[in-house]
Amino acid sequence: MSAAGPSMMEIEAEEAVLVAERQLLDLPPLLERLGQNVRDLDPQFVITCARGSSDHAATYAKHLIEIEAGIPTASHSPSISSIFGTRWRRLETTLFLAISQSGQSPDLIVSAQAARKAGAFVLSILNAASSPLEEESSAVLPIVAGIERSVAATKSYIGSLLAIAHLVAEWTDSDPLKAALQSSPAALRSACELDWAEGVEALLRVRDMYVIGRGSTLAVAQETALKMKETCGIHAEAISAAEILHGPIAIVGAGFPVLVFVPSDAAGPSVASLAADLAEGGARVIVAGSGVRGAINLPWVPGLHPAVAPAASILGVYKMVAALSVARGLDPDRPRLLHKVTETL
């Protein structure tokens, strides 16, 4: 927070609580129908299609769908359709999941057209009330985040995660996941109270860093790295806790900053162990989601379902990043060279 008050980025991040409440209030009838649509389709394969923050939500969707539904899920590169004009064959039993805030980017629209023409069921998760992407979709799940004024997406990203979780819960008829989502507003309220000032201090003069996650927290790492770049001018690279061991760990020397998100699931112990090893080796390690010896341990919301925990974690990130941006003399609401709606071919 600056002397002039909280940034729009921070205000809108905290509005994610209202988004979670709105989804629980407004979406159940639609979610029930969409869940039945997907069960009737009985997809053999899921393809995600998105850009930017929405593509990080797609990373989350891949993990959750493969864990909860047992369906292989892969990311589609929009340029395959928009630039190279690939014609898909036999997508009749495929769920094509497009995720977008605005639904305006031409490459996503062309990709949805191509997938639907090949027989896929195109389900778009959108924040915009109406858009060209909606017109090319078989069905739409609204994020209901409302207008977002800050260039950096916050509540719409959190809303995307929760909308995906709601969809998967209905599709798989998962009582544990449905119950966890009922508590999502409370989880986000708790996240609003997290104090990550130690993280701001530790990253104040950083130029390069790694952001590490695995499984349910890889999407959190990806989104965090993007926000570090666009609002703080930090060259942050998101990487899996497994992938970093296949070479990239070589640049982690004494004092190298690493932010680690430890998941609250089966992957947690391996990620916490890596964080401990990096700290022991002299890296400046910041951890959210666990207590790691030798690291700066940020507070987190304990006891959350692994599908809900990422939404709470990224809310804490947004508040920290907004404060870090201001502390570095920048404006988190107006990143250089960026616009709210980005259209790519």
Residue ranges of predicted features:
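Active-site phosphate/pyrophosphate-binding segments
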Residues: A4-Q44, A139-P257, A267, R328-L345
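Tryptophan-centered motif/residue detector
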Residues: A20, Y60-H63, W196, V317
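Glycine-rich phosphate-binding loops that contact phosphosugars or nucleotide phosphates
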Residues: D40-R189, R214, I249, A254-P257, ...
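Composition- and surface-driven signal marking solvent-exposed, interaction-prone regions
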Residues: T224, V271-L274, S313, R336
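Generic C-terminus detector
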Residues: L304-L345
